[in-house]
């Protein structure tokens, strides 16, 4: 069960609205797209059997030595099947040559145990815990990557 990543562009971005109507994403995901004020390093659809099942991106601010990873699998029937792990490994392989960063960071809700386990299996480790102003408890994780020089 292999996934592929397809770069999101102006030509295929309209399909993204399908994810925005998924009602349960807000239960475990704070954002479903890169931040507008960030430099997007890579933004992709996660494709399985020729169908977009989610999205993954790396974003950073100019001058930062790290990028932030965002990912979601939109349809619950595709969660827990290893697609997220494949997508994370694939985006790091694809974008590593373009990244001038030392690490990748992410934030996951403490209640999202499945995602936290996925990130750990991809080599991320916890470096902080905090509670957001809306009361949601969050784990911050990071992974050191090899710099391309």
Where are the regions a protein language model picked out?
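Conserved active-site alpha-helix within GNAT-family acetyltransferase domains
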Residues: 85, 110-128
């Amino acid at each position: 069960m292999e996934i592929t990543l397809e770069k999101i562009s102006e030509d295929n971005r309209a399909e993204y609205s399908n994810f925005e109507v998924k009602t349960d994403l807000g239960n475990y995901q704070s954002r479903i797209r890169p931040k507008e004020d960030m430099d997007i390093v890579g933004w992709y659809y996660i494709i399985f059997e020729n169908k977009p099942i989610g999205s993954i991106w790396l974003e950073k601010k100019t001058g930062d030595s790290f990028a932030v990873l965002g990912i979601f699998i939109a349809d619950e029937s595709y969660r827990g099947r290893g697609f997220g792990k494949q997508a994370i490994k694939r985006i790091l392989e694809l974008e590593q040559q373009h990244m001038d960063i030392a690490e990748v960071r992410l934030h996951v809700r403490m209640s999202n145990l499945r995602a936290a386990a996925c990130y750990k299996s991809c080599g991320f480790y916890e470096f902080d815990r905090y509670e957001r102003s809306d009361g949601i408890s969050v784990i911050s994780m990071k992974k050191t990557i090899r710099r391309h020089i």
